[in-house]
Regions:
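Intrinsically disordered, low-complexity regulatory regions
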Residues: 1-105
């Protein structure tokens, strides 16, 4: 039987993804996604905000979740990643100096 902790477990897993190895491998989310934004702009000529970049990653994960749900499957890793990207959005917002907002980056 499933327990109520299953929902909380994936939140903890996502937290560990973005604060553990991910943070060690890629560094602070603002620094990491500032590079992503620069590369994307160089390739496309389009300037993304920090929130745009992170929400784009959430969109990628949501599209993959939809594809799997249409096949009556739930891909756990993709779900954890989507939650993690939302956590990174929150972290980026809180890491930016006042009065900057995520949307202004």
């Amino acid at each position: 039987m499933k327990t109520e902790s299953v929902g909380a477990d994936i939140l903890l897993e996502a937290h560990q993804l973005v604060t553990g190895p991910r943070n060690n491998d890629y560094g602070n989310v603002v620094d990491d996604y500032s590079k992503v934004i620069q590369i994307f702009e160089g390739l496309t000529g389009i300037r993304m905000s920090m929130s745009d970049a992170l929400l784009f990653m959430v969109s990628v994960k949501m599209a993959r979740l939809r594809t799997n749900l249409e096949k009556n499957r739930l891909h756990h890793d993709t779900l954890a990643d989507a939650i993690g990207y939302l956590g990174l959005l929150n972290q980026a917002y809180n890491d930016l100096p006042y009065p900057s907002t995520v949307a202004e980056r």
